[in-house]
Amino acid sequence: EFKPEISAILNLTPDHMDRHKTMECYGAAKANVFRNQDPDQYCVMNYDDKTCFALAENCRAKVVPFSRKEELDFGAFVKDGRIVIKDENGDVTDICGADELQIPGMHNLENALAACAMAYFGGIDHEVIAETLRSFRGVEHRIELCNEIDGIRFVNDSKGTNPDAAIK
């Protein structure tokens, strides 16, 4: 029985529709990640993606929202250009500047917020989280700069699997 201490759902956009057929089926499949979690465990969810965040209604784990757009009462978010975590007691921990991330794109800021929340609520020291975010340069085939010629950037994003990924 799969039962993670910390789970996450980053978004819910049309992808893998050949397998799932409908968005409802796809959402249900993603929600399986937290199906067996207990109230003392965590599920990190994208507050800005309302379709995704609606899945939280059926989650027994503590839902930890993240947002790149709004300051939250609890969770990971950007405040004054800084990635911060606000815990259950309302204490705010500054992690690092959003501009210190080495990977481009708003979706990567969202990924960083989710990773930050998972690490923080998993007990990782905030300085370790900050250094990891500052030093992570991405993965092969994902917005990978191959060359720049006469001001034109050539980017390998062959791991992108849907239009939403290409747009972001």
Task: Label the predicted regions.
Residues 1, 7, 165-168:
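Short, intrinsically disordered, charge-balanced linker/junction segments flanking boundaries
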Residues 3-153:
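Acidic, Mg2+-coordinating active-site environments of NTP-dependent enzymes
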Residues 138-141, 156-167:
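Glycine-rich phosphate/pyrophosphate-binding beta-alpha loops
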